[in-house]
UniProtKB/Swiss-Prot annotation:
Catalysis: reaction(s): a fatty acyl-[ACP] + phosphate = an acyl phosphate + holo-[ACP]
GO molecular function, one term: phosphate:acyl-[acyl carrier protein] acyltransferase activity
Function: Catalyzes the reversible formation of acyl-phosphate (acyl-PO(4)) from acyl-[acyl-carrier-protein] (acyl-ACP). This enzyme utilizes acyl-ACP as fatty acyl donor, but not acyl-CoA.
Name of protein: Phosphate acyltransferase
EC number in record: 2.3.1.274
Alphabetic keyword roster: Cytoplasm, Lipid biosynthesis, Lipid metabolism, Phospholipid biosynthesis, Phospholipid metabolism, Transferase
Subunit and interaction comment: Homodimer. Probably interacts with PlsY.
Example GO biological process: fatty acid biosynthetic process
Organism, scientific name: Escherichia coli O1:K1 / APEC
């Protein structure tokens, strides 16, 4: 395995270094070829490294940063005031070639804007998209994008997302000839926004995309598609709704019957069912798929959930490792060139319209 260096914005997220630094140590234990640059306030980071052994410390470096971008800051304001912030410094390390990827749990809008400013989109990509890999009931995985980087998307962007998602499904998830679908309010051709229907028409003409049509939100976890494409507003709401339902379900499994008097055999049956069902559905736990890749840039950027715990942030670090190892940006660029050798104009500016 090739040695990798990642830059971590350890100050970002709801819990900052108290979660990100222990997660960094966990990631180092799991990968002997990994070096981590911890970007943030040294006074906040150093005490949390007390339990790190000599070998771990040899693969850690603290990169000082003067400030933190607030989670509630407007993206435009955050970008203007970003110099010296932990997020910007981490991204600059990628731009300078000192790190191969950046991981942050900070402000999504600021991360999107700064990454686009510093790392630049690939040729043929208008705007990057946030993408994650979700488990489904068939024990497989589905690539979903956009998850919030772009609230409003025209048809051209949706087609670009489909191309990028298809590459990620092939190269990282290792799904041959992945099926691609557009998230819509129905499966009929006439349903949905103009942007969705226009994107559908274009995807049907691209031989390298295994486009299967529309998919409704209630089929997200069924395994009917390998790549699901949507605008960022829809994707973000869909993802958070799904996460909330899964967390509620797992919580109910653990708490069912608490505080009630039951016979000993009912208690044994309850415990057996809890363990069995928890094992059966543990792959749906949101902590196990934390980390959305900002796809479409000339570098690798992973956005962790702001409320991620130690385990979840360590998963986001692993997502960055996989993206770098599989050379995702380079492979997307190659796919775009093969699909559109004469240029990258896909549509004549198709805009989102009204529902039908």
């Amino acid at each position: 395995m090739t040695r990798l260096t990642l830059a971590l914005d350890v100050m970002g997220g709801d819990f900052g270094p108290s979660v990100t630094v222990p997660a960094a140590l966990q990631a180092l234990n799991s990968n002997s070829q990994l070096t981590l640059l911890l970007v943030g306030n040294p006074d906040a980071i150093t005490p949390l490294l007390a339990k790190a052994d000599f070998e771990q410390r040899s693969r850690l470096q603290i990169i000082p940063a003067q400030s933190v971008i607030a989670s509630d800051a407007r993206p435009s304001q955050a970008i203007r005031a970003s110099r010296g912030s932990s997020m910007r410094v981490a991204l600059e390390l990628v731009k300078e070639g000192r790190a191969q990827a950046c991981v942050s749990a900070g402000n999504t809008g600021a991360l999107m804007g700064l990454a686009k400013l510093l790392l630049k989109p690939l040729e043929g990509i208008e705007r990057p998209a946030l993408v994650t890999v979700l488990p489904h009931q068939q024990k497989g995985k589905t690539v979903v994008l956009d998850l919030g980087a772009n609230v409003d998307c025209d048809s051209t962007m949706l087609v670009q997302f489909a191309i990028m998602g298809s590459v990620l499904a092939e190269e990282v998830v290792e799904i041959p000839n992945p099926r691609v679908a557009l998230l819509n309010i129905g499966e009929e051709e006439v349903k949905g926004l103009d942007s969705i229907r226009d994107a559908s028409a274009v995807l049907k003409t691209i031989p390298s995309i295994n486009y299967i049509g529309y998919l409704e939100a209630n089929e997200l976890l069924t395994g009917k598609t390998d790549v699901l494409v949507c605008d960022g507003f829809t994707g973000n709401v869909t993802l958070k709704t799904m996460e909330g339902v899964v967390r509620m379900f797992l919580s109910l499994l653990k708490s069912q019957g608490e505080g009630k008097k039951r016979s000993w055999w009912l208690l044994l049956l309850k415990r057996w069912l809890q363990k069995s069902l928890t094992r059966r559905f543990s792959h749906l736990n949101p902590d196990q798929y934390n980390g959305a890749c900002l796809l479409g840039l000339r570098g690798t950027v992973i956005k962790s959930h702001g409320a991620a715990n130690q385990r979840a942030f360590a998963v986001a670090i692993e997502q960055a490792v996989q993206a770098v190892q599989r050379q995702v940006p380079q492979r997307i660029a190659a796919r775009l060139e093969s699909v559109y050798p004469a240029g990258f104009e896909l549509l004549d500016g198709g805009k989102s319209g009204t529902l039908r």
